[in-house]
Amino acid sequence: TAGAGVENGVLLTTGSTQTDSSATTSASVDEGAAASGTAPAAYLEVISLASGEATVTVEDSGNNVSFSTKAVFTSVTGRTSERVTAAGSSGRYLRVVTSGTFSNLVFVVGFSRG
């Protein structure tokens, strides 16, 4: 958004890019504590998608056992990027889940607690 400040956050994907060959639940990232930021946001950058359609979701949890959906990106069929806002506070643990029928999704997801 023009005029918006910098949003600091954390990468939820492994390394500079992550490649999922099919639907995957990634390992969670421990943020150390729950946060009650005023405007949490998630960021998706799809570098490539070999075939199919993928949906990328960010989930959060207070105990690293029971996760709930925090943010859902628009389904992707190729190279794209998107920023979505998430309501309310976010749990201590965050993870990325990919779903759909696809092959070789190369992507990056970041999350800012606001």
What is each stretch, according to the model?
Residues 1-114:
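Signature of extracytoplasmic/envelope-associated structural regions
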